[in-house]
From Swiss-Prot:
InterPro entries: KsgA/Erm, rRNA_Ade_diMease-like_C, rRNA_Ade_Mease_Trfase_CS, rRNA_Ade_methylase_Trfase_N, rRNA_adenine_dimethylase, SAM-dependent_MTases_sf. Probable S-adenosyl-L-methionine-dependent methyltransferase which specifically dimethylates mitochondrial 12S rRNA at the conserved stem loop. In contrast to mtTFB2, it does not have a critical role in either transcription or regulation of the copy number of mitochondrial DNA. The gene is mtTFB1. This is Dimethyladenosine transferase 1, mitochondrial. GO terms for cellular component: mitochondrial matrix; mitochondrion. The keyword S-adenosyl-L-methionine applies.
Length: 330
């Protein structure tokens, strides 16, 4: 028997005529809040393009949209007829516009859920308890949380939890153009950084297109990049996420120095030079490379030998080179 959404598609049903997003924003006197890093995207051609970048959305799929705001991208998602649409919006001021969209979408037999919550604290497994549906994560992210949210989701992906209990959960997200370029930056690239390596350990990030800042209201000072992150079927490491993140963060803490400088800050000063030299030799990585010249595989080998070092020297895991040194008081 055909699923409800499939029947809707076959019958040619569409969303009923509605006011434009620009008209709704004006009608409900909605203004973007700077403290929430809000920027409204009014052009439906662009919201359609974002959703198209997510790839095929089947009638049995579930879409989780982050920060729908007045509902521009939401409309574009509804036109693709997923079985379920789950919205997570922190700002309750958008309740009336989102409720209007929900009512207009009711003839399409799409399960439409709205949650007013902070996505950084939102328990996805509680609201999506089973893994029978493929999940698409889509969002025009507030700049203030975009990097933190991506790191959180990469952590979930590494642990196969939350939205990533299935390996086919893709992320299609907006970032400041510079951040988007960093996520996708190749080895040796000017923008290569910690975020590049962490993203590329567990996903294949693809820069889909750039949205000029003038397309948003209010206009941000930067352009916006749309990135699709496709989980790798075979992750490049089985090491714990937090360990890889710690090693990569230290390596890139001195981006323009030899990579041994940042990596060395993982180790206590007493025998730092000697131990670091041995670890680089075991990892078969040249210690005079700059961090941005390291491949993902080289970073992971450095993480692996560090992990092995902790087996014999577990106290090193607690070492923090930024901690104040003990000073003898006379």
């Amino acid at each position: 028997m055909a699923q409800p959404s499939a029947r809707v598609l076959q019958s040619g049903m569409r969303l009923p005529p509605m006011p434009t997003i620009r008209e709704l924003v004006k009608l409900y006197r909605l203004q973007a809040r700077k403290q929430l890093s809000q920027n409204f995207l009014m052009d439906e051609r662009l919201t359609d393009k974002i959703v198209k970048s997510a790839g095929r959305i089947d009638p049995r799929d579930l879409v989780l949209e982050v920060g729908p705001g007045p509902g521009g991208i939401t409309r574009s998602i509804l036109r693709r007829h997923p079985q379920r649409l789950l919205l997570v919006e922190k700002d309750p001021r958008f309740g009336e516009t989102l409720q209007l969209l929900k009512e207009c979408a009711s003839p399409l037999n799409i399960q439409f859920d709205i949650h007013y919550d902070d996505i950084l604290r939102f328990n996805i497994e509680q609201h999506i308890p089973d893994t029978s549906q493929r999940i698409h994560l889509i969002g025009n992210l507030p700049f203030a949380i975009s990097t933190r949210l991506l790191i959180n989701w990469l952590d979930d992906l590494a642990a196969r939890r939350g939205a990533f209990r299935r390996i086919d959960t893709c992320m299609t997200l907006t970032f400041q153009q510079e951040v988007a370029e960093r996520i996708c930056a190749p080895v040796g690239g000017e923008q290569r950084c910690r975020l590049s390596v962490m993203s590329q350990v567990w996903t294949e990030p693809v820069m889909k297109f750039t949205i000029p800042g003038k397309a948003f209201v209010p206009k941000p000072q930067v352009d916006v990049g749309v990135v699709k992150l496709i989980p790798l079927k075979r992750p490049k490491t089985q090491l714990p996420f937090h360990l890889v993140e710690r090693v990569v963060r230290h390596i890139f803490s001195m981006r323009q120095k030899y990579c041994r400088r940042g990596y060395g800050t993982l180790l206590p000063p007493e025998d730092r030079e000697e131990v670091a030299e041995k670890l680089f030799q075991r990892a078969e990585v040249q210690d005079t490379l700059r961090p941005f010249e390291l491949t993902v595989e080289q970073c992971l080998r450095l993480a692996e030998v560090y992990s092995e070092h902790l087996v014999t020297r577990p106290e090193v895991a607690a070492y923090d080179y930024r901690a104040p040194k003990n000073v003898e008081v006379l």
